[in-house]
A protein has these predicted regions:
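Structural motif corresponding to the intra-repeat A-B loop/turn of tetratricopeptide repeats
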Residues: 8, 39, 78-79, 129, ...
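"A position-specific structural signal for the A-helix of alpha-solenoid helical repeats
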Residues: 31-32, 63-71, 114-121, 159, ...
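Amphipathic alpha-helical segments of tetratricopeptide repeats
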Residues: 49-57, 90-102, 140-151, 185-196, ...
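DNA major-groove recognition helix of helix-turn-helix/homeodomain DNA-binding modules
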Residues: 1-14, 254-255
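Short C-terminal boundary/hinge segments that cap the last helix of small helical domains
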Residues: 8-26
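Structural signature of alpha-solenoid helical repeat junctions
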Residues: 25, 63, 107-117, 152-159, ...
């Protein structure tokens, strides 16, 4: 039922009312595992994978999809093994999308949030392996899907800005700075409307970088200064300093 609601583009708020204690324990463990993966805490990911594995011994299907995804992220982050990570991600996505080849979008399919998360990770792996156009193709699919099919909700608020952030980065790598600016600008507007503070400063930064690459240094300086101010307000002084150093080194913009 939960996945049906997701494919219809909404969140299932009835889920907690109709599950057993064991199902709720597994659901909570999987949600915690997803949070650990998002935070990139390798030790917590290892511990939570072990916990979920014990809870899924006699269960087949969708729960193993998330487990394979988490193992793929662990291999990518801890072991830096991109090939093994891709193998695990493809095993995960093939549980529900057996026809997906890892490159070509399946635009007629409805997607769950887990599938969006896995496809995004596959795109990131393509980019890390130098296949930036493959990454852009997949991420544009997810962008369009989230805009057209998914109504407002917590998962959209969390995931959609990061998809735009990735696209902004990858368009920049390919020298498509107008497109990089457009993706970052769209992400900033979304963050302001829906309150995603975590993604906001990095998207503002990408706006500034894209403008600098286009030679619009005064406008670039404005957005990069905003980025530094927000990072400092969030007490992320290391991130603020990284922006300051980057601006000085690459664009001779001093703060």
């Amino acid at each position: 039922m939960e996945k049906l609601f997701e494919r219809l583009g909404t969140e299932n708020n009835l889920f907690n009312s109709f599950v057993s204690r064991e199902e709720m324990e597994l659901y909570s463990a999987i949600q915690e595992l997803i949070r650990d993966v998002t935070d990139g805490d390798i030790k917590k990911i290892e511990i939570q994978i072990s916990k979920v594995e014990k809870l899924t011994v006699n269960i087949s299907g969708l729960e193993h999809q998330c487990l394979l995804f988490a193992k793929g992220e662990l291999v990518k982050q801890r072991d830096k093994d991109q090939n093994k990570a891709m193998e695990l991600m493809m095993k995960a996505i093939h549980i529900t999308l057996p026809d997906f080849d890892g490159i070509n979008p399946l635009r007629s399919n409805l997607l769950t949030f887990d599938e969006i998360m896995i496809i995004n990770s596959i795109a990131v792996l393509h980019a890390k392996n130098g296949k930036v156009m493959d990454a852009i193709q997949l991420e544009m699919w997810l962008k369009d899907y989230m805009e057209d099919k998914i109504v407002d909700g917590k998962m959209k608020t969390a995931k959609y800005p990061m998809i735009l952030y990735n696209l902004s980065n990858w368009f920049g790598i390919k020298g498509c700075h107008h497109e990089a600016f457009q993706m970052a600008d769209l992400g900033v507007d979304f963050c302001v409307s829906y309150g995603n503070l975590a993604a906001f400063p990095i998207l503002v930064s990408n706006k500034g970088v894209a403008l600098a690459e286009l030679g619009e240094f005064e406008e670039a300086r404005k957005y990069l200064h905003q980025t530094i101010t927000v990072f400092e307000a969030m007490k992320k002084t290391d991130r603020a300093q990284a922006v300051i150093d980057w601006c000085s080194m690459h664009y001779n913009i001093k703060f």
